[in-house]
Amino acid sequence: AYYIIAPAEASSNLARYDGMRYGLRVEGHDIYDTFKKTRAAGFGDEVKRRMIIGTAVLSSESYDVYFMQAARVRRMIADSFNTAFEQCDLIVCPSSAGTAMPLDSGLSPLEFYALDLFTVAMNLAGIPACSVPCGLATNGLPLGMQVMGRRFDDMRVLQLAKHIESVASVDNRPTTIMGK
């Protein structure tokens, strides 16, 4: 659901940054060349990829099949979190399956999408969440955990995140930046 809804929302929201009224503008020899150069210069590869996916799922041919189904899944996820928060105030879990990735990791777009898996549910549910550094792994890269709370209970999430960060004493910077 996330990989349908997020690109659809990105496509819709970023459509106004056309270089004519908003955002970066790169002049071309005609209007079409201006659009092409502006979009090429103004958005990175991942943003462009998500905009293309989003435009496709919002098309009349795909809207009911993909977007509306994803919206139903989003509602189910939100309902599940609401049920969970009847039993507790906050949920703490890892931010990802491992450490942060080195900047030069060379991961494919699909591998980068997989890194989001631990964070997509709360984004879909519309609940506050905060990722907090909680130490460095033996490879020198940071580890993180995230705190999630009820909808509009942002302050409680931030208070626990601040406490975790102070207790974890993560005052070290990562020893590995570029995979070295």
Q: What are the residue ranges of the model-derived segments?
A:
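Glycine-rich phosphate/pyrophosphate-binding loop
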Residues: G23-M51
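Gly/Ser-rich, acidic/histidine-flanked active-site/gating loops
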Residues: A1-S11, R16, M20, L136
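Short gly/ser/thr-rich secondary-structure transition/capping motifs
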Residues: E27-K37, A71-D79, E111-Y113
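Short, surface-exposed loop/helix-turn segments at secondary-structure junctions
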Residues: Y2, H29-I31, V65, Q69, ...
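Short glycine-rich anion-binding loops that position phosphate/pyrophosphate groups of nucleotides
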Residues: G19-M20, V57-S59, S96-T99
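Structural helix-boundary/capping segments
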Residues: K48-D79, Q87, L124-K180
